[in-house]
Curated annotation (Swiss-Prot):
Coiled coil: none annotated. Belongs to the universal ribosomal protein uS10 family. It comes from Neisseria gonorrhoeae (strain NCCP11945). The gene is rpsJ. This is Small ribosomal subunit protein uS10. Part of the 30S ribosomal subunit.
Length: 103
């Protein structure tokens, strides 16, 4: 489509899974003749939590946990209807959140 692009944003806790799925999207889009910009790694969001180890006492003894959310961004320009059909047929792995916007 003229002057439109598809922006895909991927979110996952496992960086290997998100990279593998991003590569699959790039290969599928290029196979249909579209131009792909990315995947661009965005800053990793790190959430840290402190919880008490003991249920009753020992406030100084704590467990530190963190969750890392990895993000990837890619733009598909010069796409066709074949590109959208091929992207819709991709199997989405469990653990990857996908946001798709047509701009």
């Amino acid at each position: 489509m003229a002057n439109q692009k598809i922006r895909i944003r991927l979110k996952a806790y496992d960086y290997a899974l998100i990279d593998r799925f991003a590569q699959e999207i790039v290969e599928t889009a290029k196979r249909t003749g579209a131009v792909v910009k990315g995947p661009i790694p965005l800053p990793t969001k790190i959430e840290r939590f402190n919880i008490l180890r003991s249920p009753h006492m020992n406030k100084t003894s704590r467990e530190q946990l963190e969750i890392r959310t990895h993000l990837r961004l890619m733009d598909i320009v010069d796409w066709t209807d074949k590109t959208t059909d091929a992207l819709m047929k991709l199997d989405l792995p469990a653990g990857v959140d996908v946001e798709i916007k047509v701009q």
